[in-house]
Amino acid sequence: MPIQKPRPLATLALLALFTSQANAETARPTEPGDAGAYLAAQYASAENDFRAAVGLYDRALATDGQNATLLDGAILANIGIGDIAKAAKLAVAFEALGGKSQQSYLAIMAERAKAGDFAAILENTKNDPGVGALFNGLVKAWAELGNGDMTKALAGFDAVAATPGLESFGLFHKALALASAGDFEGAEVIFSAKKGTQLTLDRRGVLAFVQVLSQLERNPDALSLMDKTFGQVTEPAIVDLRRRLTAGEPIPFDVVRNSTDGIAEVFSTLGSALNGQAETNYVLLYARIANHLRPDNSDAVLLTAEQLEKLGQHDLAAEAYGAITPDDPSYYVAEIGRAATTRAAGRKEAAIEILQALARSHGDVLAVQNALGDGLRRDEHFAEAIKAYDTAVAMLGTPNSSHWSLFYSRGICNDQLKNWDLAESDFRMALKLEPDQPQVLNYLGYSFVDRGINLDEALGMIERAVAARPDEGFIVDSLAWALFRMGRFDEALAPMEKASLLEPVDAVVTDHLGDVYWSVGRKREADFQWRRALSFEPDEADATRIRHKLAVGLDAVIAEETAVPTPAAEATVAPVEPATDGN
């Protein structure tokens, strides 16, 4: 049973069950008393600067506390910073003025769930402002369970499951409800698809199934499920769970302990399902509330932080990641995320310090060493990066296709340190693991051309990379530059012009275009492109060479470099950043 995200079509069907993410209905807006604060709050909200927006809305509300427009904006801003309790108070005031919005509805729902006021939740679902049948159906079922009526709860989950496109959501939550009530046999029937419907479980769903099997004294089956799902993943939490199952330890069911947890799981389930499909702010709304109701659900914390990163709110994202404590199995994942968002905020040294500290506490985790290597490589500390990558490689055992980026990244470092033999070995290993990986094909092929070796193999590699990524400018540039370096100037022209269209403000690509124009006799155009390249602020070595070409022409520069090789004569390949795979 592989871990999967919802299929795009299924997610589109899910989205169709949600109405517009805008307010369904608000009270008649009135002119705010502090117009300056109101306008500034609106601007901050539009920029997703939730913290600034909260302060500005507070200021505006201090002079006009009965303004529904201000209240509704403040609700959303407070949810953005994670203050659900304050958002709920604002929501009560907003609805007292006749206002209705999804954020007010969800904030009030969250506080009632946290307080265990399930009767109020059942009453509240009658006033849905447009959240949708899926959310309300699941929440009502959990609230019925919280009220002590299992029959109505199960009927509610069944009603959701009977809705076209929602069967898996209804069945999954029904299984969780049964397990939370101690009916592990009933939960296992659903998880095992004994009634014909195979659920597609995410990581948390698989762990719930594992716990159910363990409670049924079926640890060997639980281990088999883990092997099938996670393979040889070295994640500490998975390793520890395997150890406990192997020792015969009964694993308690704690994914959902009560109805409040169940409602938290509704927010988490829908937030995860909508991630990447709905607007980021909308996903954040669900993730923040899931995190509020279940602070120990690290998946909800990570989902929250991910949305904040997407919105460019790196300080808030770092705070979210920082909420996961060192004793949590997801701590190392959170710290890697905190380092990434810290780096994105421009604090590169602080990001490296986070990773170095993590390597001291979790140095036996492959993903940690890989992340440290990546961070050091990006800051051009290549020798230190290689040490981290070496440590990661030593942990691999038998490498598989998911490890290609580790060898690719180490190869880049070796190349930058002029250790070409080691670099080539790493690149070839990356291709052995992932033969059609365009980033590796591009880098290795370009490097061969740059050195004047293995030219036929090099051109074939680059052509395969272009076939896989025809609209990636740097890879198309590699093809053109390879043809240029092989003296096939006319053939280089078309891909070089395409690369320039794809990367119109890149100094290296523009410089290359000038060289190709010069070589096919279009010297005025070459001069123009070289001057453009200078305007894009290339590094100093490239800038010096471009200025020399403008002064004496490309032929003279090449003649000089051929007579006395210099570092400036070497064309460089711009590596495409390997995808982060967490391995």
Q: Each predicted region: which residue ranges?
A:
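N-terminal leader/linker segments that initiate helical-solenoid repeat arrays
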Residues: 22-92, 99-103, 114, 123, ...
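Residue-level detector of the short coil/turn that links helix A to helix B
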Residues: 48, 82, 116, 148, ...
